[in-house]
């Protein structure tokens, strides 16, 4: 009788559930996974090397394109690393704006993750709900930076500009008549803070809608409970962070453990799972969105009461205002030097990490005193998570591999860098 052999198949990189360009080589015994071998590098763009040929500020837009669903969080880590090298103090208003946009980014990321994770498993409706709210938050991105995704809004020393006092309006067209446009513009009559205030009042109700669709849905639970279990010991050994480690019961969150910006001044809780499976990680992300909503509300209240500068007044780092340049030759020279040569960062090295929606996103920057980085190392959270794919998916059915990829929330921009 012929011997029974395992067979090997390719999962991706063209598979719709591969979340980009993931290629998994799966060794299967029937439908049970014996081995999963992730192949990475299909989206490698050499970001770390490219940064060595650009000035410090010119590399900010590269950061947006790493994890391209959590844009401003990437910029934040990079700007913090530069600020540590420079020893620059960020104005308090800029810190609150950064924290507010970090949390907007967290909600954007989790909405995309929960929507597409459900879509992968077969719950088609969820993604339609989550993209409805993403649209509002993308408008907040667009209001401050002009771009819906790659904002390049943070700068070493603060943010590019203060929050706008009016929101862009929808105009009637052949797809939307005047009545529809009037409803869409109802929340856009005031400033960006008014728009976000309106959103944060509505958002908890939307979260309840998502929970109605998924949390007690028995098919969703059958597909996620007990799937992709990670013990606390394994999570620590594999270097997990974010919802992947919190889902396993370890309350590790850089916003609480190593507070940066004004996270020690805002009130929020860290959701923690019990069983370390896909379902617990989903619940963690759901609760994180509610906590982010709380933080945004606190930031809105503070920003309304406290006007002030949004970028450092050190003109070796940040450009002077137009008014100053018109009357002062010194400021004009600063401006010219900044935008031709760039700032010179003192010799040294610094590591800055933020609590990114996916985990700990770190930037290790080495300066040799020049106007560009000597070396830039990016610590992507998804890299450690994907590395454990083989261990986590072993013994599961091939359909469960899709659920595990969804719960890891992998984005190849940051993994391949």
From Swiss-Prot:
GO cellular component: plasma membrane
Tagged with keyword Endoplasmic reticulum: no
EC number: 7.1.1.-
The protein's role, per its UniProt record: NDH-1 shuttles electrons from NADH, via FMN and iron-sulfur (Fe-S) centers, to quinones in the respiratory chain. The immediate electron acceptor for the enzyme in this species is believed to be ubiquinone. Couples the redox reaction to proton translocation (for every two electrons transferred, four hydrogen ions are translocated across the cytoplasmic membrane), and thus conserves the redox energy in a proton gradient.
Coiled-coil segments on the chain, per record: none
Name recorded for this polypeptide: NADH-quinone oxidoreductase subunit D
Keyword vocabulary terms for this entry: Cell inner membrane, Cell membrane, Membrane, NAD, Quinone, Translocase, Transport, Ubiquinone
């Amino acid at each position: 009788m012929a011997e029974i052999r395992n067979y090997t198949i390719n999962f991706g990189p063209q598979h719709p559930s591969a979340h980009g360009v993931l290629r998994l080589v799966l060794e299967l015994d029937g439908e049970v996974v014996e081995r999963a071998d992730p192949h990475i590098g299909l989206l490698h763009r050499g970001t770390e090397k490219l940064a060595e040929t650009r000035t410090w500020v010119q590399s900010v837009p590269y950061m947006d394109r790493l994890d391209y669903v959590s844009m401003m969080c990437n910029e934040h880590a990079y700007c913090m690393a530069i600020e540590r090298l420079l020893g620059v103090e960020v104005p308090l208003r800029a810190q609150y704006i950064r924290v507010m946009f970090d949390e907007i980014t967290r909600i954007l990321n989790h909405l995309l993750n929960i929507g597409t994770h459900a879509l992968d498993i077969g719950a088609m409706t969820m993604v339609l709900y989550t993209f409805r709210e993403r649209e509002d938050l993308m408008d907040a991105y667009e209001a401050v930076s002009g771009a819906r995704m790659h904002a390049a809004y943070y700068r070493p020393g603060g943010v590019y500009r203060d929050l706008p006092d009016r929101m862009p309006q929808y105009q009637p067209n052949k797809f939307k008549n005047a009545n529809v446009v009037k409803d869409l513009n109802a929340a856009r009559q005031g400033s960006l803070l008014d728009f976000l205030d309106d959103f944060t009042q509505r958002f908890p109700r939307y979260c309840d809608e998502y929970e109605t669709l998924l949390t007690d849905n028995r098919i969703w639970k059958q597909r996620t409970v007990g799937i992709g279990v990670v013990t606390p010991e394994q999570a620590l050994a594999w270097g997990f962070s974010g919802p992947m480690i919190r889902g396993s019961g370890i309350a590790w969150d850089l916003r609480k453990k190593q507070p940066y910006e004004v996270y020690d001044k805002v009130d929020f809780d860290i959701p923690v799972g019990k069983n370390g499976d896909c379902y617990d990680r989903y619940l963690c992300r759901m609760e994180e969105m509610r906590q982010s909503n709380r933080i945004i509300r606190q930031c809105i209240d503070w920003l309304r009461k406290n006007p002030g500068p949004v970028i450092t007044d050190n003109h070796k780092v940040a450009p002077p205002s137009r008014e100053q340049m018109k009357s002062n030759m010194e400021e004009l020279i600063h401006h010219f030097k900044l935008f031709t040569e760039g700032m010179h960062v003192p010799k040294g090295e610094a590591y800055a990490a933020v609590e990114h929606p996916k985990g700990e996103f770190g930037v290790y920057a080495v300066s040799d005193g020049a106007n560009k980085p000597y070396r830039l190392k990016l610590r992507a959270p998804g890299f450690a998570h994907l590395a454990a794919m083989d261990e986590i998916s072993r013994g599961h059915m091939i359909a469960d591999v899709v659920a595990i990829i969804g719960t890891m929330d992998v984005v190849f921009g940051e993994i391949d860098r």
